[in-house]
């Protein structure tokens, strides 16, 4: 008889969350149905931004949305818990986009969002955390590089 095993996504999340918690991040979670304020306004997404359109976002009859990302959870957790720096949060979760599905797009996907606020943190810290994370996932011999780029579709 063959023993069962964990789903690949569960395995990925366990490795990911362990990596970040070992580095002082706390895991935060939030609802999959959000207010427009937490999903867009709190993140300074303009009212006329294409991501707010019905062809990109699932809207409920009550004016709420299925979250399009986990980033708005950062704001909610910090606000509701009156958190102050220093803080490190990691937010995993399922996200939804009202898109046509193809080989590179799905209406549902998982995202891991992180935020770290402290004195003297800089891009070197971010790059170090992400480099270590990629090595945790793909092996210590992985070579990474940072390639700054402008993505106007997310501006």
PLM features: residue spans?
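TRNA-recognition modules of translation machinery and tRNA-sensing kinases, especially anticodon-binding
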Residues: 1-155
């Amino acid at each position: 008889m063959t023993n069962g095993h964990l789903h690949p996504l569960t395995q990925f999340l366990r490795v990911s969350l362990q990596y970040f918690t070992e580095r002082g991040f706390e895991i935060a979670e939030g609802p999959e149905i959000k207010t427009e304020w937490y999903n867009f306004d709190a993140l300074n997404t303009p009212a006329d931004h294409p991501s707010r359109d019905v062809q990109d976002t699932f809207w409920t009859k009550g004016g709420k949305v299925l979250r399009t990302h986990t980033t708005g959870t950062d704001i909610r957790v910090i606000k509701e818990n009156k958190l102050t720096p220093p803080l490190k949060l990691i937010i995993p979760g399922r996200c939804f986009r009202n898109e046509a599905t193809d080989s590179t797009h799905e209406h549902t996907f998982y995202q891991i969002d992180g935020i770290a606020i402290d004195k003297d943190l800089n891009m070197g810290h971010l790059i170090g955390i992400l480099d270590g994370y990629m090595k945790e996932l793909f092996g210590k011999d992985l070579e990474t590089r940072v390639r700054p780029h402008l993505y106007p579709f997310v501006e």
